[in-house]
């Protein structure tokens, strides 16, 4: 601001007259500049968080991170400062493609509550994805990652309580060995799973005898989505959507080989479990939330 820089050399009245600037406007601008200077620490912290998380965080998650760092700030201010600096979170791209089997299932959807509306003579189905503790409800699915060098398939297990990826397998083909390896890793990590509900869609691998037996031997109860209804497994679908939006869409051509893609997928899952905070988990990461609950003993 030229008037501010010259006021120490010349009378303010003369400078305001020459610049045709009202006194009230000058002091308003001066106050605004002073206010912006006070925001320097916050803005620097916002920039650090934004680039540390590779533009994956929007203003709400950045607000939670700032509060963790001791800043007293609300989401409205963070949104305003981010907008001023031109910092915007990655936005969802085209819907990802999730690999589906083509067999008919017979297992019931245990996450679906049937409510009869007698007054309006209709039946309403309400999905219930709430789990009060870890190892109460797990979900799984398979999703495809396609680049010029080929395809990789990700098969993870998601705990619906703390949204943690319990185990996963990355394979060049969606075969049962992939599913078996995923289960073995989860079962080695968690020993007491009796009564756990394990939900999936109607993919062919979840209808195999070997899959049924593996769950039954652990006392696990199987649940399956209704045919052709992806919303019945939306927590798992949402994870795939977040993952692809934050590390895959727009970056496909940066992966020169399947090995590079697999490393990026593994790094993201590690990041998701241990660094990426979730607003519904009170601003904690999945692992932090588990460690603060009884899940740590399971």
Predicted regions and their residues:
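Residue-centric detector for conserved, function-critical "anchor" positions
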Residues: 1-9, 14, 36, 298
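K/E-rich alpha-helical interaction surfaces of small helical-bundle regulatory domains
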Residues: 13-33, 52-55, 60, 264-282
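Mobile genetic element proteins and their domesticated derivatives, centered on retroelements
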Residues: 15-19, 26, 46, 62, ...
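Basic, flexible linker segments flanking DNA-binding modules
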Residues: 23-132, 229, 287-294
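RNase H-like two-metal-ion nuclease catalytic core shared by retroviral integrases
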Residues: 98-102, 200-202, 208-211, 224-244, ...
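Active-site beta-loop-alpha junctions of metal-dependent nucleic acid enzymes
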Residues: 146, 150, 169-191
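Short loop/turn microsegments at loop-to-beta-strand junctions
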Residues: 152-155, 166
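C-terminal domain-tail junction helix/linker
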Residues: 216-220, 242-298
